[in-house]
Each structure stands twice: as C-alpha cells, then as structure tokens.
Amino acid sequence: MRFSVVTSYLLCAAASYANAASLFGLSFPEPPSANKPIPGDSPLLQCDVDQSQSLDVTQVNLVPNPPQRGENLTIAAAGVLQTTIEEGAYIDIEVRLGYIKLISQTYDLCEQLEENDIDGLKCPIEEGVYELNKIVEIPSEVPPGKYSVIARAYNVDDEQITCLTGEVIFPAY
C-alpha cells in the first residue's frame, strides 16, 4: 500500500512538472545515458560509461541472436585491456526475470575464467588486445520471460574493469 501511494505521488509530481514545463515553453535536456551499445550482433550494452573502465569491449557477437532454448550459444567477443587483471579480481552479477531478482552474487573472476575454460585465460591477465570465443548450452527448461543481466567486474584494488548489461526475451513455449 505504501509503495503504491509513494509511486502515485511521484508519478503525479512528474506529470505536473512536465505540464508546467510545456505550459511555460521550457525544455530540459535528456539526462545522459550511462549505457552505450557494443558493436556487433548482441543485445549487450556497456554500462557505467561515465566511469573509468580498464576494458574497452570493441565487439560482441552472439549466434544465434537472440539466444534460443535448448541450443548452443556461441559468444565471440573482442576488447582492449588497459591494466593487468590480478588474482582477487571479482565480478558482481545480477539476473532478473521481469522484476524478480533471480541472482545477485559476487564471484571470483579468476576462478570463473579457469572453471569455465575461457580460451585458456588465467590470472594474471596482462594488458593487450583479446579475442575470446565460448560456446554455452542454453537449457531447454528456461522459463519464458524477459531476463535482464548486469555484470560489473573489478580488479583486486576495486578499480572497475568493465560493466555489461543486456536483456533477452525467451517467448512462451
């Protein structure tokens, strides 16, 4: 109840503000987006672009795009790493199905690279240009819905490596 009252109040205030601005001929610039598209064929965006990041993701391709239940997904990514990734680097991942948070977890980035055999990468990962390929199986049991993912990777000193976000819709069966 309290949420709906507060939400209604905020929506009314926003509508009143918009009406007053148009009534007096005022226009306000759109706030800058903190996301930018990543070249290639994927739904991924680089997020937190207003913050310093040590990985410039130059391209991501998914085959098939969009991903399909019960099929393999081939991920091809390229980027330029500007700082060495050391042991102790970590990644914060959040996955939502609609408004429902399914996962919100921190993982050891170096362990994940080794466990998932990402082109043989192991920490420390030196500065340089990288092209990575990985095939993952999408389970046929994935429930229908709109999935949102955000992943922020940090080095051991808490400097951001990168931030990626995207949405995938799995239609009804």
UniProtKB/Swiss-Prot annotation:
**Which residue stretches, if any, does this entry annotate as coiled coil?**
none
**Which region is the signal sequence?**
1-20
Q: In the record, what terms sit under GO molecular function?
A: sterol binding
Give the top-rank taxon of the lineage listed in the UniProt record for this protein: Eukaryota
Q: Which SMART domains match?
A: ML (SM00737)
Name the GO terms of the biological process aspect.
intracellular sterol transport
The name this protein carries in UniProt is: Phosphatidylglycerol/phosphatidylinositol transfer protein
Identify the species of origin.
Kluyveromyces lactis (strain ATCC 8585 / CBS 2359 / DSM 70799 / NBRC 1267 / NRRL Y-1140 / WM37)
Q: Upper taxonomic classification of the species?
A: Eukaryota, Fungi, Dikarya, Ascomycota, Saccharomycotina
